[in-house]
Amino acid sequence: MPRYMLLLYAPEASAGEEAEREAEMPLWLDLTQSLKDAGLLVATDRLRSVDVATTVRVRDGTTEVVDGPFAVTKEFLGGYYVLECADLDEALAQAARMPLARYGSVEVRPVVDFEEVGPNA
């Protein structure tokens, strides 16, 4: 079955909004359990704040390490799900169930299966 990565992007939260997001944790736990029960969940994790991110670039043999994300953006990558879905339509339907879709965005990308396409995909 094809795999899809759901990348969860959220705007930076104010103190009040952060409390609201923490209050929705039971929704996330229920969603994750339902994905497990349906046999769709491959992996999921929440990422720490961009405040502790580090970006590494190598240019002309020189390694550059910079605190923070690669690009300044209004939304940050806060977590991900990897799901096994029958097709893109099912993956999109699951993305729409994410509580974050109401105030952020969920990017859905097919995952390359190297066993099917080989190492040159």
Where on the chain are the PLM-derived regions?
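Conserved, structured core segments of small domains
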Residues: 1-121
